[in-house]
Regions:
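Extended carbohydrate-recognition surfaces in non-catalytic/accessory domains of CAZymes
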Residues: 22-103, 158-169, 174-177, 185-204, ...
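Accessory beta-strand-rich segments of carbohydrate-active enzymes
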Residues: 28, 40, 78-197, 388-390, ...
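Disordered, acidic Ser/Thr/Pro-rich linker "stalks" and the adjacent N-terminal cap
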Residues: 51, 55-60, 113, 825-895, ...
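Active-site-adjacent substrate/metal-binding segments within catalytic domains
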Residues: 61-89, 93-101, 106-114, 119-122, ...
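Glycine/proline-rich low-complexity spacer/linker segments in large multi-domain proteins
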Residues: 118, 138, 143-185, 279-291, ...
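Beta-strand-rich structural segments
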Residues: 222-226, 293, 636-639, 680, ...
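Substrate-binding/catalytic cleft of secreted carbohydrate-active enzymes
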Residues: 298, 353-601, 605-608, 614-626, ...
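Short S/T/G/P-enriched beta-strand
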Residues: 610-635, 644, 689, 694-723, ...
Length: 1001
């Protein structure tokens, strides 16, 4: 108790005492003491409007948070609402500049201060700022009012143009002010804010050049846009100080003094070499604070602290380098809303770290935020946890022209300016569908103007043949390149509810059972009598599918030849309140549920992704649980990166598993016996390298409560939350994996129950009666603005109850302002350590290059079968006697593997014969795939290989449940959307072919 009191007092002292405005610059938390009204009252802009009966809220707070995961995305309420705030500036603010920064509003917003209209912001995605100085009443109360319309069909007022990304499929409409708001008070000589929307300013830019990773050196540059709003010239000195993560100053330097005329904007710069640097990396969120200050007449008048990191990047030869080490992209395409049940996207900064940090714990190195610019809080979170980001601006499924394209370029410009100091962003993405070469060049020019030194690649989805793109990649399919890197923007759309273990245990869900219809993402209409099995998995089959799909990218990793895949991102990390195809009214493709409780695929990816390219740490995971009825006989699946896996039941060996897709081991017909099930992995030398076990749990006896919270303590600011975890345990403290008990919760004290999610009516959103699923569940509890003790009790029929006590610490708010900036107290995580200096992969294959080709038809197009362009192909004329092509190799070689991408890869099986000179080295039918196939051929020394069709191809989609979102388009070589794509005759069609020699280790 004494320690709790001491922590309480220290926290109070640390975040209290809002002093008078400082001599330089103040940033205030502007989230407190807002008032919310749902409905349109034009008079609400007036200062004297009576708002005493409005709902009191702390931002960030969407007006419709109660609907998150209760309603499907297209049903989320859209309407007009007003937010109002009363505040006073601290003493000493007079004659200073005052700016307000909104990290984002949804959708279109009109802003008023003291009854005066100050501006409009409409894109619903990016931050916006306003200069309040002309309207502020110093020493008096000020009133800010914001009218917001989150209509799904909101159109830009000036042009009547709808924003492409205001979409009912992917952009969950949590309307109002769902992000943070800050107030800045500065001198009249000041560094601008990076808020191009409305203010037209670019702020501070920090970057490093001449990075030498091994010697830990780099030249650090600081650049600030400044303004002089005095009525006389000011001679301004520019100074820079760099502090390490512990706050220790490691370097100070300065630029030349500059005379800035009244009303003038100038850019000041300084740079210096710094040694002993720690470079930001995957799982290594090492961040520095760079303080840039302005000095006039020997006095500091302005200072901006920028938290950033330094890292080295390179993009080329189909690969990506981070700090001189090749890294294959492994991660998730996550909805930008990154939402939670009962609150939507508006969670405290520490909870963003928890969620994004789980991706790193899952051995993901990349998150691709889909369609819309991510929230600044998530961007900064990824900096801290060491998670690479691909930053979207705003789009939907198509390239656009006219005003809609201009909206996209403007948003990209604003997003780059706002986020260019965040080291975790390595990619700027210009579209969720291929854009034209001209548009790619235009976007690239924006990057070059506003972030020329950030070490970031700019590209778009696909871009398979546009060399101006610096990266690209399709959805669902596998791409390879020896030019700009290709990584899959989205793969494995399958869905599975966490509750469903398998068909052998409660609730006995057979794979695929559920609906036979789903809502189309293109038409928003229900498609009936469709195969929806892939969207109603149990956890066994969901895990297997995730293993199979990743294997496609792992097989093409760096080290397997000249043309490689740079990996891919699985859709999605956590279940999401967006477009779905399964039974529930939300998408369950996540490897965690919406409360971030892991499903089995979470652990499968942890196994498969533990390395920069090659596996560096062998792991093993047994899929499922070990609690069944005595007569159950079932397959046991193990995911492991070991070379061999042996299964033991109560110490008795059940033999070695059948290995498929490199990572999946199957043990058929295992009879259940209570006790301990162990899987042991062995390396290539037969030495044990990893081990996992499952234990049979006993009868459910008791409830266990635990809490996940801010590492700096729970804050009574009306926005902070704790994540309450509830488990059902046996008498020995083992979780009961089949428990589905309904738990009733009571909360006493200053806190608000926001709840969790479970299968049932309204998904149990906000309900204090919440069942566990597979023995576990979680709920969110939000603080109020009153600090104090909170007690939570949990009860269920037939189980021993549990309770837990918490305490929230006070946060001082004075006149609507607070010094407490939640993200500033959170530290970078260094869990994976610094970038290793060793190579990330070993070459396992080498290519035998092609000199030329002779074909039975269309000779002039034969080169297209080996031109590193997946949008081109060679094909014959449809006659069997012309269905052949002979390749001349650069050297005589014993080719033992042929890798091909054949047109119609998911629809067609080609009956082929392959010859080395005159000797037959392979004969058979090719498998259907999502891109490339690999044929193991008889190695014969030759410098000439012929591919010949020996009959009509067999048709039929091999991946009927894998469907695209975009509308049909002609000319796509998968032929999936092509008219008569399954009518083959005697066509031989090759997109790309590679001849390989394996380097046996």
């Amino acid at each position: 108790m004494r320690n709790k009191i001491l922590l309480f007092l220290l926290t109070f002292i640390g975040i209290s005492q809002i002093a008078a405005a400082s001599a330089v610059r103040d940033k205030y938390n502007f989230n407190a003491e807002w008032l919310l009204y749902v409905g349109d009252i034009p008079e609400a802009k007036e200062v004297r409007f009576q708002d005493a009966d409005w709902k009191k809220v702390t931002l960030p707070r969407p007006f419709n948070e109660d609907e998150a995961f209760r309603l499907s995305i297209e049903q989320l309420t859209d309407t007009v609402m007003w937010y109002r705030k009363h505040f006073r500036l601290p003493a000493g603010s007079k004659n200073k500049k005052v700016f307000v920064e909104f990290e984002g509003v949804r959708q279109g917003a009109d802003f008023y201060i003291n009854g005066e209209y100050i501006g409009l912001h409409e894109n619903g995605a990016m931050a916006v700022g306003f200069d309040l100085t002309p309207y502020i009443k110093y020493g008096q109360e000020n009133v800010m009012a914001v009218r917001i319309d989150n209509n799904w069909n909101y159109k830009e007022r000036a042009t009547g143009t709808k924003y492409q990304w205001s979409d009912r499929n992917f952009n969950a409409n949590y309307g109002g002010i769902p992000k943070n708001v800050w107030l800045h008070v500065t001198d009249k000589v000041y560094q601008t804010l990076p808020l191009y929307s409305n203010l037209k300013t670019t702020g501070v830019y920090i970057y490093a050049e001449d990075i030498r990773v091994k010697s830990r050196k780099a030249v650090v540059h600081a650049e600030s846009e400044i303004k002089n709003e005095y009525n006389r010239d000011k001679k301004v000195a520019y100074k820079v100080e760099v502090l390490d993560r512990d706050g220790k100053s490691i370097k100070s330097f300065e630029g030349t003094q500059t005379v800035v005329k009244p009303g003038e904007t100038a850019t000041l710069e300084a740079s210096a070499e710094i040694d002993g640097l720690h470079f930001w990396s995957w799982g290594y969120g090492y961040l520095y604070t760079v303080k840039t200050s302005l000095w006039v007449d020997g006095r500091k008048v302005d200072e901006v602290a920028t938290r950033t990191g330094f890292r080295k990047t390179r993009f080329g030869r189909g690969m990506i380098w981070l700090n001189d080490r090749v890294i294959q992209m492994k991660g998730f395409a996550q909805r930008t809303s990154n939402e939670w049940p009962g609150v939507g996207m508006s969670v405290p900064a520490w909870l963003s770290d928890y969620s994004n940090g789980l991706m790193v714990e899952d051995n993901a190195n990349l998150v691709r935020w889909m369609h819309i610019t991510p929230w600044k809080q998530d961007i900064e979170s990824c900096d801290r946890v060491g998670l690479i980001q691909a930053m979207q601006a705003g789009d939907a499924e198509k390239d656009r022209e006219g005003r809609q394209w201009e909206q996209r370029t403007e948003l990209m410009r604003d997003a780059i300016i706002y986020n260019r100091n965040n080291p975790s962003i390595l990619f700027y993405e210009c579209g969720n569908e291929s854009i034209s070469r001209e548009h790619m060049i235009e976007m690239k020019a924006i990057r070059d103007k506003y972030d020329p030194h950030g070490g970031r690649a700019i590209g778009s989805r696909e871009m398979l043949d546009i060399r101006e793109a610096e990266y690209g990649g399709e959805m669902l399919y596998i791409n390879k390149s020896k030019h700009h890197p290709m990584w899959a923007m989205e793969y494995c759309r399958d869905e599975g509810l966490r509750k469903y273990w398998d068909e052998y245990s409660y609730p006995y869900h057979k794979n695929g059972e559920g609906n036979n219809s789903f809502r189309s993402a293109m038409t928003n209409k229900v498609q009936k009598k469709v195969d929806a099995r892939a969207y109603n998995h149990n956890q066994d089959s969901f895990t297997i599918e995730n293993v199979i799909r990743w294997f496609d990218y792992w097989r093409e990793r760096p080290g397997t030849g000249d043309r490689v895949s740079s990996g891919g991102v699985k859709i999605i990390f956590s279940d999401t309140n967006t477009h779905y195809r399964g039974v529930e009214n939300y998408r369950r493709s996540g490897v965690t549920d919406a409360m971030r409780i892991p499903k089995d695929p979470f652990y499968a990816h942890q196994v498969m992704w533990d390395g920069w390219v090659d596996i560096e740490n062998p792991r093993i995971h047994i899929v499922g649980h070990w609690n069944y009825k005595e007569d159950v006989v079932k397959p046991v699946y193990v995911v492991s990166s070991a070379e061999k896996v042996e299964l033991f039941l109560n110490g008795k060996s059940l033999g070695n598993g059948q290995r498929d897709y490199h990572f999946l081991y199957t043990f058929k017909d295992v009879a259940f016996v209570p006790g301990k099930l162990e899987a042991v992995g062995y390396d290539k030398n037969g030495k044990e390298c990893c081990r996992a076990e499952l234990q049979t749990a006993g009868k459910p006896e008791q409830i266990k409560l635990s809490v996940i919270q801010n590492p700096k303590g729970w804050k009574a600011d009306g926005a902070d939350m704790v994540l309450l975890q509830v488990e059902v345990m046996d008498k020995d403290g083992r979780r009961c994996p089949l428990a589905n008990d309904l738990i009733h919760f009571d909360v006493e004290g200053p806190a608000e129950w926001r709840g969790g999610i479970a299968q049932g009516k309204d998904n149990y959103i906000l309900s204090k009666d919440l069942p566990v699923e597979c023995g576990i569940n979680r709920a969110l509890i939000r603080s109020l603005t009153t600090p104090g003790a909170v007690r939570i009790t949990a009860k269920a029929d037939g189980l021993q109850s549990a309770e837990i006590s918490l305490s929230s610490a006070p946060v001082e708010v004075k006149n609507g302002l607070s010094d407490y900036i939640p993200g500033d107290e959170l530290e970078g995580r260094l869990t994976r350590g610094e970038t290793p200096l060793t190579p990330s992969y070993k070459d396992t294959k080498v290519d035998v290059n092609i000199l030329s080709a002779v074909a039975g038809a269309n000779q002039d197009e034969a080169i297209k079968s080996f031109d590193d362009n997946e949008l081109s192909e060679w094909k014959n004329d449809g006659r069997l006697n012309s269905a052949w092509i002979t390749y001349s190799l650069e050297r005589a070689a014993r080719v033992d593997e042929i890798c091909m991408k054949l047109t119609g890869w998911r629809l067609r099986s080609y009956p082929l014969e392959i010859y080395a000179g005159d000797e037959l080295i392979w004969s058979g039918e090719t498998e259907k795939s999502l891109g490339y196939i690999h044929l193991n051929v008889k190695p014969v020394l030759t410098n000439e290989i012929t591919i010949r069709l020996k009959g009509a191809s067999k048709e039929g989609d091999g991946f009927g449940q894998i469907v695209e979102v975009a509308a049909p388009a002609a000319g796509e070589l998968d032929l999936f959307k092509a008219k008569n794509g399954d009518k083959t005759n005697h066509e031989l069609r090759i997109v790309e072919i590679e001849f390989k020699e394996n380097l046996w280790q």
